[in-house]
C-alpha cells in the first residue's frame, strides 16, 4: 500500500522525490477531507466499507506528516467518522423482541471485514501518532459480540474431497478456510457475497485489543474467538506484510464466553446445545430485515430463511461463494431453505423483523420466523412461518407452514461438493404423489437435493445415523438409543393424552430417558408429565424442565410478558413451594393446584419442599489490589455462602481460593503480571449452584490504566461526559478546568462511566464542524478522567473538551438512534416511510 510504501522508502528518496510525493499525498488528504467525495457532514455516505476506505486517507497523512498543521484535525475527523459510521450501521438491541444488537449493515462473509480491516489499520497508524485509541463506540462493542456469537460449533476442518474441490473451483475465496485436520475451530457460516465458511480473521482479535480499556468483556470474548496469527481477510496463506506489526505482542487468549443460543436484530437466530463439548451443535437460521443492508445476497431477499447446521465437528449445510451472493439465481436453487410456489417461482420467507419469541428451555429449544405482510409482502399469504425445534443435542424438527395444503413447495438442502448430507426424514408434505419429487443437483461448488411437495413440510434432521422418526397427526415420534421422544408440532392446536403424558398446543416436546422425563412447552396451554401438570392461558409462555427420581422438579421458563401458570401437583409434591431464581413465589393454593404469577424474561423454576438450588452467580466487577483483587458478585436468592474459584489455565481446571457468606470475596497471593480467571458458585445447606460465567483478573501492583473513549456530547448549558470501562477499577475520577491556565478540579467521583456537567457558557456543537478556530476563551472546559483501584490512581486519560467547533464534539443528529430508512423529509409523518423508521426501544 501507499502508506507503508512511503514510510519504507522515504529514507531512500531524493529531496525532489520527497517533495513531489509529499505534495501528491497531501493533495489526496485535502480531496478526501471535504464533503465533495464521500460526504459526512451533509449526509452519511456509504456503503460503510467504502467510507472506511475513503476517510482513511487523511489520517494516513497524519501518520506520515505528524507536524502538518492539519494533522490533529484529520485525526479527529476520522474518529467522528468511526462514531457515525458505527452508530448508523449497527443494528440495535430490541427489547420487545428479546433481540441483541450488533449486526453490521454489510454481510458477514466479506464486507464487515472490508470495513474493519482498513479501519483497524488506520487506528494503528493514529496510535503511533499520539497514542490515543480512537476506534471506539458502544456499537463496536456490539459488533464484536455479534461476530463472536455468529460463530459455529467447533468444526474439525473441510473434508479432503471438499477442500480439493474448493481449491479447484473457487480459487481466491479460500482465505480463512479450515484445511482438513486443522481443527477444531469455530467458523462463520458462508453468508452473503464472496462468502466461505471461514475462521474469523485476525481483525477480530485486534478489535478486541482496541476495546480492552473501553468494553473489556467484549474485548476478552473477541480475543478468545480469534487469534493474531489467523489469516487476514483476502491474505494469502503464510503471507508476510508490513501490517503484521499490528499483531505482535504478549499472548492473550481472552475469556471464554460459553456461547448460548442468541437472536440478533436484523440477522436471525443461532441455536446451540452441548456447548464446549464434543457433542456441541449449532443451527443458524437467517432472516435480515428492511433497512441498511449490503451484499447479503440476491436470492431470498438476502438469504432469508437459509439455514446452516454444524454438529460433530462437521458442516452439514453450505452455500457457494455467490449462490446466495451476487449470483442472479432463484431463492431455492442452491442453498438450504424452503420456498412456496408463487407467481411462477419458488419464494423463500423474505425479509422481516424477528417478531416471534425464541426459547431455550434446557431439554428443547424453539425459534420461528415469519414473512412480512402488507403492500410490500414477498411470500404472504401463501407462506406462514418457518420454525426449528431442537431436541437436546441430537436432532431438530424443521417445520414450514403454508396457508393451505394444496400449495406446492420446495424444501432444499445443500452441502459442499464432496461432503455428506445429514439424515433428513420427511414426515409431512412428501406424500409420494406427482407433486412430491426429489431432484439431485451438483454444481462445481455444491451438491444437494430439492424435495418438492405440497402443503406443510415437517422434516427431522440430524447428524446421527441411529435416529428413527415416525410422522403423527400431532407431529412425530423420534427414537434414539436410550430415549423416546414425542414431538408436538402442528399449526393448529393439538390435544394429546397418553398415560400420564398430556399436551395441548402447537409446539412442544416430551423426552423419556431411563428414570428421567424432560419436557418443553413452547406454544400451548397445557403440558403434563408424571402427574405434574402446567396450565396457562398465555400461548407464548415457554416452560421446560425435568423430573428425575429423588430430585425436585425444576427447569426454565421464558415469558415474553408477565404471565401466570396453574400447577397441578401430585401428592408427592403437595407441600412444595414454587421457586423462581431461588426465591419463593407467592402462590394461590387450591387443593392440589398452585397458581403462580411469573415475571417477564428468562428464569429458572423449581418445585421443592426444601431449599432450592441457587442460580449461577455473576461477577459484577473486580477491584484490583497488589497480588490479587476483590470480587464483587450479584447476590442470588437462597444462597448462604459463595465459593470463589480460580483458574490459571484459561478455564480448564479450577481451584477454590475463598468462601464467604457475603457477596464480596478475595483472590490474593497471585503472581505479578499474570492473568487468571475467576468464577463463583452459590451454596446453601443443601445445594450448590452451577458455576457462574468466568471473569478475567490481570494481577498487578501498579496503578491502573486510564479508560479510553473520553467523549463529550454538547448541549446548551450542559456537557455529557462519558468514558470506557477498566477491569479492576474501584471508581473513576473526572477532572475539569476552564481556561488553559486554570488548575483542574474534581467534578465527579464514582463507579458510573458518565456524568452530566452543567455549567453556564457551555454551547451546543456547531452545525458544521471544523469551520472556525478552536475556542480558547474561559467558557471552554477541558476534561480528563482517571481510574482508581487498590494500587492507586492512574495517569490522566487523553483529554476532551467542550469546543463547539471540534470534529470530536460534532453531532449532526443529537440523540438520534439507528435509522432504518436512508432519509425522510423533516416533519413528514412516520407512515410516509417505506417501513418503520426506527426499531421499538
What is each PLM-predicted segment?
Residues 1-151, 823:
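Aromatic-lined, polymer-binding surfaces characteristic
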Residues 667-687, 757, 761-794:
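Beta-strand-rich modules
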Residues 586-588, 656-661, 746-751:
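Short beta-strand segments within Ig-like beta-sandwich modules, predominantly Fibronectin type-III
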Residues 612-637, 672, 687-728, 777, ...:
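Pro/Thr/Ser/Gly-rich low-complexity, intrinsically disordered linker/stalk tracts
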Residues 107, 114-580:
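Extended polysaccharide-engagement surfaces of secreted carbohydrate-active enzymes
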Residues 647, 736-737:
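Conserved Ser/Thr-centered positions that define the repeating blades of beta-propeller domains
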Residues 449-460, 591-612:
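C-terminal beta-strand-rich structural cap/linker in extracellular carbohydrate-active enzymes
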Amino acid at each position: 500500500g501507499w502508506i507503508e510504501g512511503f514510510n519504507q522508502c522515504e529514507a531512500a528518496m531524493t529531496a525532489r522525490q520527497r517533495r513531489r510525493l509529499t505534495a501528491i499525498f497531501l493533495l489526496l488528504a485535502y480531496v478526501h477531507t471535504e464533503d465533495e467525495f464521500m460526504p459526512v457532514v451533509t449526509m452519511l455516505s456509504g456503503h460503510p466499507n467504502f467510507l472506511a476506505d475513503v476517510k482513511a486517507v487523511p489520517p494516513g497523512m497524519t501518520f506520515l506528516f505528524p507536524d502538518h498543521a492539519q494533522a490533529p484535525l484529520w485525526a479527529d475527523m476520522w474518529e467522528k467518522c468511526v462514531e457515525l459510521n458505527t452508530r448508523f450501521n449497527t443494528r440495535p438491541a430490541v427489547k420487545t423482541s428479546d433481540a441483541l444488537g450488533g449486526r453490521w449493515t454489510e454481510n458477514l462473509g466479506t464486507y464487515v471485514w472490508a470495513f474493519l480491516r482498513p479501519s483497524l489499520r488506520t487506528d494503528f497508524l493514529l496510535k503511533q501518532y499520539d497514542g490515543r485509541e480512537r476506534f471506539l463506540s458502544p456499537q463496536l462493542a456490539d459488533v464484536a459480540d455479534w461476530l463472536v456469537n455468529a460463530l459455529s460449533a467447533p468444526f474439525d476442518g473441510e473434508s479432503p474431497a471438499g477442500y480439493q474441490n474448493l481449491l479447484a473451483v473457487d480459487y481466491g475465496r479460500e482465505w480463512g478456510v479450515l484445511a482438513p485436520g486443522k481443527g477444531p475451530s469455530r467458523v462463520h457460516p458462508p453468508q452473503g457475497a464472496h462468502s466461505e465458511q471461514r475462521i474469523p480473521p485476525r481483525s477480530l482479535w485486534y478489535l478486541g485489543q482496541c476495546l480492552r480499556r473501553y468494553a473489556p468483556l467484549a474485548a476478552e470474548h473477541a480475543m478468545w474467538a480469534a487469534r493474531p496469527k489467523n489469516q487476514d481477510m483476502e491474505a494469502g496463506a503464510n503471507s508476510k506484510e508490513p501490517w503484521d506489526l499490528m499483531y505482535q505482542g504478549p499472548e492473550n487468549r481472552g475469556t471464554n464466553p460459553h456461547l448460548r443460543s442468541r437472536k440478533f436484530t436484523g440477522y436471525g437466530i443461532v441455536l446451540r446445545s452441548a456447548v464446549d463439548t464434543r457433542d456441541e451443535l449449532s443451527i443458524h437460521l437467517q432472516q435480515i430485515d428492511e433497512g441498511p443492508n449490503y451484499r447479503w445476497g440476491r436470492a431470498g431477499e438476502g438469504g432469508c430463511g437459509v439455514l446452516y447446521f454444524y454438529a460433530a465437528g462437521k458442516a452439514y449445510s453450505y452455500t457457494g461463494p455467490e449462490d446466495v451472493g451476487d449470483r442472479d439465481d432463484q431463492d431455492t436453487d442452491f442453498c438450504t431453505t424452503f420456498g412456496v410456489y408463487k407467481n411462477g417461482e419458488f419464494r423463500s420467507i423474505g425479509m422481516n423483523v424477528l417478531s416471534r419469541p425464541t426459547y431455550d428451555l434446557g431439554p428443547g429449544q424453539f425459534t420461528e420466523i415469519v414473512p412480512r405482510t402488507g403492500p410490500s409482502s414477498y411470500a404472504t399469504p401463501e407462506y406462514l412461518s418457518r420454525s426449528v425445534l431442537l431436541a437436546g443435542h441430537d436432532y431438530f424438527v424443521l417445520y414450514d407452514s403454508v396457508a393451505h395444503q394444496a400449495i406446492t413447495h420446495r424444501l432444499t438442502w445443500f452441502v459442499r461438493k464432496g461432503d455428506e448430507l445429514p439424515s433428513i426424514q420427511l414426515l409431512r408434505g412428501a406424500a409420494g404423489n406427482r407433486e412430491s419429487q426429489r431432484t439431485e443437483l451438483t454444481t462445481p461448488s455444491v451438491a444437494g437435493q430439492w424435495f418438492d411437495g405440497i402443503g406443510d413440510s415437517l422434516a427431522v434432521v440430524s447428524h446421527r445415523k441411529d435416529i428413527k422418526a415416525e410422522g403423527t397427526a400431532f407431529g412425530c415420534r423420534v427414537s434414539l438409543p436410550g430415549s423416546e421422544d414425542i414431538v408436538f408440532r402442528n399449526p393448529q392446536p393439538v390435544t394429546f393424552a397418553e398415560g400420564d403424558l398430556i399436551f395441548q398446543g402447537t409446539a412442544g416436546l416430551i423426552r423419556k430417558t431411563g428414570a428421567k422425563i424432560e419436557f418443553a412447552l413452547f406454544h400451548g396451554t397445557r403440558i403434563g408429565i408424571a402427574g405434574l401438570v402446567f396450565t396457562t392461558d398465555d400461548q407464548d409462555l415457554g416452560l421446560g424442565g425435568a423430573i428425575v427420581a429423588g430430585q425436585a422438579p425444576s427447569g426454565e421458563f421464558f415469558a415474553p410478558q408477565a404471565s401466570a401458570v396453574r400447577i397441578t401437583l401430585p401428592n408427592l409434591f403437595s407441600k412444595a413451594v414454587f421457586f423462581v431464581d431461588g426465591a419463593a413465589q407467592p402462590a394461590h393454593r387450591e387443593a392440589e393446584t398452585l397458581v403462580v404469577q411469573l415475571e417477564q424474561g428468562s428464569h429458572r423454576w423449581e418445585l421443592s419442599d426444601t431449599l432450592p438450588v441457587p442460580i449461577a452467580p455473576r461477577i459484577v466487577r473486580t477491584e484490583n489490589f497488589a497480588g490479587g483483587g476483590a470480587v464483587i458478585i450479584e447476590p442470588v436468592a437462597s444462597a448462604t455462602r459463595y465459593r470463589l474459584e480460580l483458574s490459571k489455565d484459561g478455564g480448564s481446571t479450577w481451584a477454590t481460593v475463598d468462601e464467604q457468606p457475603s457477596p464480596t470475596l478475595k483472590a490474593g497471593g497471585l503472581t505479578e503480571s499474570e492473568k487468571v480467571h475467576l468464577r463463583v458458585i452459590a451454596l446453601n445447606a443443601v445445594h450448590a449452584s452451577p458455576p457462574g460465567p468466568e471473569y478475567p483478573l490481570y494481577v498487578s501492583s501498579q496503578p491502573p490504566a486510564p479508560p479510553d473513549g473520553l467523549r463529550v456530547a454538547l448541549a446548551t448549558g450542559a456537557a455529557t461526559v462519558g468514558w470506557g470501562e477498566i477491569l479492576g477499577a474501584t471508581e473513576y475520577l473526572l477532572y475539569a478546568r476552564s481556561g488553559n491556565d486554570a488548575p483542574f478540579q474534581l467534578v465527579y467521583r464514582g463507579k458510573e462511566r458518565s456524568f452530566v456537567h452543567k455549567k453556564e457558557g457551555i454551547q451546543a456543537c456547531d452545525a458544521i464542524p471544523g469551520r472556525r478556530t478552536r475556542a480558547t476563551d474561559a467558557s471552554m472546559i477541558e476534561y480528563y478522567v482517571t481510574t482508581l483501584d487498590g494500587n492507586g490512581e492512574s495517569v490522566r486519560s487523553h483529554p476532551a473538551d467542550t469546543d463547539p467547533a471540534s470534529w470530536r464534539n460534532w453531532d449532526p443528529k443529537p440523540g438520534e438512534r439507528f435509522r432504518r430508512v436512508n432519509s425522510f423529509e423533516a416533519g413528514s409523518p412516520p407512515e410516509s416511510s417505506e417501513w418503520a423508521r426506527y426499531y421499538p426501544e
